[in-house]
């Protein structure tokens, strides 16, 4: 039941982000949350605090990378909950050609309904290939 509810919530939150509204995502963040996106591409880094996460999300929306949820597994007590989210992310160029198509897993820790930390695992070579494409074809999107 908990996983079902978590999937409904996260699916709605991600649908809002796809629509350009990051407020629901930020509402789930604890003020001192931490977010890690491994790799060596323009998306990679360790981000601390809601404001840092907001800037990362603003770029995601500005660039137009889309995310969706396939499955959520959630467990634990309200003061020490873990959520694992499996989904996909993609980006189409202006001609409608799918340039980026990736799978991800998010491992998140929550306390009282707020995300305190999460890490995204995905094929970082695909993220680098997106960077390479944007640098060659859409350089304005590379600006942070």
Protein language model features and the residues they cover:
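Short, flexible active-site loop motifs that bind/organize anionic cofactors or intermediates
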Residues: 12-15, 43, 117
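A solvent-exposed, acidic/Ser-Thr-rich amphipathic alpha-helical stretch
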Residues: 23-76
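A general structural signal for well-ordered alpha-helical segments in protein cores
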Residues: 10, 53, 82-83
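Preference for short coil/turn "hinge" residues that link or interrupt alpha-helices
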Residues: 19-21, 26, 40, 93, ...
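Short, low-complexity N-terminal intrinsically disordered segments enriched in polar/charged residues
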Residues: 1-31, 136-144
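A beta-strand edge to alpha-helix "cap/lid" segment located at domain peripheries
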Residues: 1-5, 58-144
């Amino acid at each position: 039941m908990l996983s079902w509810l978590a999937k409904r919530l996260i699916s709605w939150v991600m649908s809002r982000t796809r629509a350009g509204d990051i407020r629901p995502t930020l509402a789930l963040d604890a003020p001192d949350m931490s977010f890690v996106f491994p790799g060596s591409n323009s998306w990679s880094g360790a981000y601390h605090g809601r404001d840092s996460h907001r800037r990362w999300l603003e770029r995601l929306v500005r660039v137009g990378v889309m995310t969706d949820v396939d499955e959520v597994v959630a467990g634990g007590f309200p003061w020490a909950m873990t959520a694992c989210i499996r989904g996909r992310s993609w980006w189409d160029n202006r001609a409608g050609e799918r340039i980026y198509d990736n799978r991800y897993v998010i491992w998140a820790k929550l306390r009282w309904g707020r995300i305190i930390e999460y890490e995204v695992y995905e094929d970082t070579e695909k993220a680098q290939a997106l960077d390479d494409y944007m640098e060659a074809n859409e350089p304005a999107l590379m600006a942070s």
